[in-house]
């Protein structure tokens, strides 16, 4: 199996291109069948928002819905709203909406807790299934998102397993009979590189390992087919491409073949088969309901539902294959355009493309690295209203400028204007100003 992305290589050779113009971008917007979906969001007029891979944009429906929950359902309905406003069913009802975006079936997903907490639960479950197998290795990528590695380190230490970190190029050779669980993030947060979930899952199963997939940069961004890929466990984020708001509840999925074996390490009362019987001993709820732990955050779930509905609105544009098929077509066109414009207009500025050109290996973001000034360049862009973000490099890769492309609210003219600002920041040396080189607490 080939690695999911090519090694970092300097781009923007001095070649002759058929230049793309602003008029071309405006023509693409005029032809875009999804352009009306932008009207679902509140976006400041002076902002070009390319950071939906960190925090999605606020849906217009969210403030009114949250106010309704606070003033009516809580303020007037009070505790009755657990029944009359269907609060009790929210984790499963929202889970069914997520299922439509990740290739899962109704009743297989719940929205609850954070990504980190849900990862703890599903990885614990996978390790419990393998506890008598003699397998002691958990495999993950060295470049995985740190919280995943921290959770895995903690669980491996507690459960007597060993975490082994690899490079993507080592798959599938590293999948030996010592491996209990393969834990991967579907789309890499630093590079935008996307794994072939179906092929890797098949290789893991052939080696006797279970798979845990993190969909934080996939759900709402790219088509995901959990059941078709025969994956074992998955978790994902609610506040990125799903537009659920800061700190929105995450989600968890388990393949139905494991549902009866899932061992809940956080056996709170909300995951009990009959929580309002108040019995002294835990009896897990059937199926995915046992993923729940404590009383659910109703106001946050209401905000998440508004975000989910913005994504599901794209189903109308591809009724056969669903929302993600429609969004994926535009996402690839946006990222292709961004790469092309940067190649045309930023040659000689020291940028390197680290996101795969191959559509089959690319998420919904474009990442560029630079030996000097990546953080300051991002800050200078933000000061101009072009919001992307920065991620620190390592011994194998310089610092990174990340740009997320959410087709629900980004247009082709937005891409043109963003690159125009990037050109100006680079050519004028604006990024060298002192205020852009002072690190903020959140980068």
Per-range role (PLM):
Residues 8-9:
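Cysteine-centered motifs
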Residues 12-443:
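Pyridoxal 5′-phosphate
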Residues 5:
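Arg/Lys-rich, positively charged N-terminal/basic patches that mediate binding to nucleic acids
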């Amino acid at each position: 199996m080939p690695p999911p992305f090519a090694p970092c290589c300097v781009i923007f050779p001095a070649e002759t291109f058929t230049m793309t113009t602003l008029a071309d971008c405006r023509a693409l917007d005029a032809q875009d069948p999804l352009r009306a979906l932008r009207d679902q969001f509140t976006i400041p007029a002076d902002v070009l928002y390319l950071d939906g891979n960190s925090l999605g944009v606020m849906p217009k429906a969210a403030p009114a819905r949250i106010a309704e929950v606070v003033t009516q359902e809580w303020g007037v309905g009070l505790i009755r709203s657990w029944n009359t406003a269907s609060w009790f069913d929210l984790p499963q009802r929202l889970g069914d909406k997520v299922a439509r975006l990740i290739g899962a079936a109704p009743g297989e997903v719940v929205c609850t807790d954070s990504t980190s907490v849900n990862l703890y639960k599903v990885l614990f479950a996978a390790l419990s299934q393998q506890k008598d197998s003699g397998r002691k290795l958990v495999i993950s990528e060295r470049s995985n998102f740190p919280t995943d590695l921290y959770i895995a380190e903690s669980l491996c230490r507690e459960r007597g397993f060993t975490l082994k970190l690899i490079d993507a190029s080592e798959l599938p050779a590293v999948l030996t009979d010592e491996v209990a669980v393969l834990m991967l993030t579907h789309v890499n947060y630093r590079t935008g590189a996307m794994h072939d979930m179906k092929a890797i899952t098949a290789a893991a199963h052939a080696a006797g390992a279970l798979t845990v997939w993190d969909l934080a940069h996939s759900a709402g961004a790219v088509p995901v087919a959990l059941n078709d890929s025969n994956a074992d466990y998955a978790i994902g984020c609610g506040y990125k491409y799903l537009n659920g708001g800061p700190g929105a509840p995450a989600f968890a999925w388990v393949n139905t073949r494991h549902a009866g074996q899932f061992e809940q390490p956080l056996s709170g009362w909300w995951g009990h088969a009959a929580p309002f019987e108040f019995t002294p001993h835990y009896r897990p709820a059937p199926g995915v309901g046992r993923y729940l732990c404590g009383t659910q955050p109703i106001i946050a779930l209401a905000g998440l539902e508004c975000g989910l509905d913005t994504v599901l609105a794209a189903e109308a544009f591809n009724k056969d294959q669903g929302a993600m098929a429609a969004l994926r077509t535009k996402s690839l066109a946006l990222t292709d355009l961004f790469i092309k414009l940067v190649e045309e207009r930023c040659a000689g500025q020291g940028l390197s493309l680290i996101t795969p050109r191959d559509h089959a290996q690319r998420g919904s973001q474009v990442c560029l690295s630079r030996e000097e000034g990546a953080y300051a360049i991002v800050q200078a862009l933000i000061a101009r209203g072009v919001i992307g973000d920065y991620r620190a490099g390592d011994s194998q890769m310089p610092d990174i400028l990340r740009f997320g492309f959410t087709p629900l609210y980004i247009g082709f003219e937005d891409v043109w204007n963003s690159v125009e600002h990037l050109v100006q920041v680079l050519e004028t040396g604006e990024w060298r100003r002192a205020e852009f080189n002072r690190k903020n607490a959140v980068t």
